[in-house]
Regions:
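Hydrophobic alpha-helical transmembrane segments of membrane proteins
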Residues: 1-76, 95-456
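Short helix-to-coil transition segments within interhelical loops
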Residues: 81-90
């Protein structure tokens, strides 16, 4: 880190002599005043003063700095010079994330020291808290602080792919997403004392926070590195995205409660993983831009037998398809083990969702293949069109009493009086299967047409 030029540059900019002297002077002065006033009260509020300053520094100040660290470079037209340097994406990520907020952490660690000191000075007027638990609290504060900084920086890096100038409102929005991390912090210390059960073991709220925040920070930092790789003209490895989806599934799968008789509670982890990966896939489609299909590059790499490069330009949304299909198989097996008709219909509903998703993939890729102008720069429009078929169209069909057509626009089960329950459930997958085949044929014809144009 100390051989990182970006980190060193930001450190010299942030840690000036005046600022280094001002921070402890401010905090110690306020602490001494609070200590004097605190003597007249029946209980001590000194630790809460320290936590208050930590929250102000972290959630108000550092989130702003993290959101602005790249946007300032964009607005000042200096980001392009940094992109052309020989610095690695990892060093740039470390420099931007930790260098721009190092002064905040200088103040935060002073707050942490005063926080621990408060429990030593006023042991008789504060709840007895063992030192290991106090150190765990400090660790949680650090993890929440890093998470609150990673989120706005990641959002700002993602947004610069589409725009090259930003207003204060944009930065405030990114900052607000980091500020929102204060809500789970409050719940950990005040609202979730019972903890959770994960993979059959009971964890307190603080233990769960350490585990899940650590996972979030690791993948958040990897995502920042991948975004910077894209800015540097390098393609991030699809393997990292695949491993991220697997880790997301592994985390959520642990919430299954196999001791419950309620299927929704019993398989809540698998259901959450399925819908989470499904949602992440659609969000990825929105952000892939014209990377969704690169027929000219595909043709070039394929005929040149550059299979590694061909693998590198694979759309991230395609990487998640095997994960979603495996989750669908697991859900089908779990619902099938219930031995109930409802389990059979639920299994068919899951596969109907898969077929609708594949239909949307074909439609969105077909759109991006021939989109022109701004439409080619983003797949947001076709994604919104595809998702509207699950909301607007079914509502209209319900309004005009045309429910018989709902299975063509959303996973919909209707028990027919002319068929058995299982036959009615099977019919759930027929409409999306037909639509998927139709869109797949259109996509195939479009790809062939595009390749013919490239040969000419």
């Amino acid at each position: 880190m100390f051989k990182n030029p970006e980190f060193i540059r930001n450190t010299w900019t942030e840690l000036t002599a005046k600022k280094l002297a001002a921070m402890p002077l401010l905090l110690i002065t306020v602490y001494l005043l609070a200590y004097i006033l605190d003597e007249a009260l029946p209980f001590s509020f000194l630790p809460y003063i320290c936590v208050f300053f930590y929250c102000v520094f972290t959630y108000v100040w550092s989130t702003r700095l993290a959101a602005e660290t790249v946007i300032r470079e964009i607005n000042a037209n200096t980001w392009s010079f940094q992109v052309m340097t020989s610095m690695s994406p990892v060093k740039m990520a470390v420099g931007k994330l930790f260098g721009s907020t190092i002064y905040i952490w200088y103040g935060n660690f002073i707050c942490f020291a005063l926080y621990l000191l408060s429990y030593h000075l006023h042991r008789e007027r504060l709840p007895e808290v063992p030192l290991p638990e106090l150190l765990t609290n400090v660790l949680i504060f650090v993890l929440f602080g890093l998470s609150a900084q990673i989120l706005p920086l990641l959002l700002s890096l993602h947004s610069i792919r589409w725009r090259h100038f930003f207003e204060k409102f944009d930065v405030t929005f990114f900052q607000f997403m980091g500020i929102a991390m204060i809500i789970p912090l409050y719940k950990v210390f005040n609202g979730s004392g019972e903890g959770i059960v994960w993979y059959g073991a009971h964890y307190t709220a603080k233990e769960a926070a350490v585990v899940f925040l650590s996972v979030f920070i690791v993948w958040g930092f990897i995502a920042i590195v991948n975004q910077i790789k894209t800015e540097f003209g390098q393609e991030p490895y699809p393997v990292s995205w695949f491993l991220f989806t697997l880790s997301l599934v592994a985390v959520l799968f642990g919430f299954n409660d196999y001791g419950s008789d309620n299927p929704l509670v019993r398989y809540v982890g698998t259901l959450s993983a399925f819908f989470a990966v499904l949602a992440v896939t659609y969000l990825t489609l929105c952000g892939e831009s014209n990377m969704a299909l690169r027929p000219n590059m595909v043709s070039k790499y394929y005929h040149g037998k550059q299979y590694k490069r061909l693998f590198m330009i694979m759309p991230r949304s395609l990487v998640t398809i095997p994960v979603i299909i495996v989750l669908a198989l697991v859900l089908s097996a779990e619902f099938g083990s219930l031995g109930q008709e409802q389990g059979t219909s639920a299994g068919f509903m899951v596969w109907a969702m898969i077929l609708f998703m594949l239909r949307d993939f074909c439609f969105i890729y077909r759109w991006s293949l021939f989109a022109q102008g701004n439409e080619k720069e983003t797949t947001v429009v076709p994604v919104l069109i595809a998702l509207s078929t699950y909301t607007i169209v079914p509502v209209l069909l319900y309004h005009f009493d045309l429910r018989i057509f709902c299975p063509f626009f959303m996973p919909y089960f209707h028990e027919s009086s002319y068929l058995t329950y299982n036959e009615s459930a099977f019919l759930t997958v027929i409409p999306p299967a037909l639509e998927f085949v139709f869109m797949l044929v259109l996509l195939t014809l479009g790809i062939r047409k595009k390749f013919r144009e490239l040969r000419v």
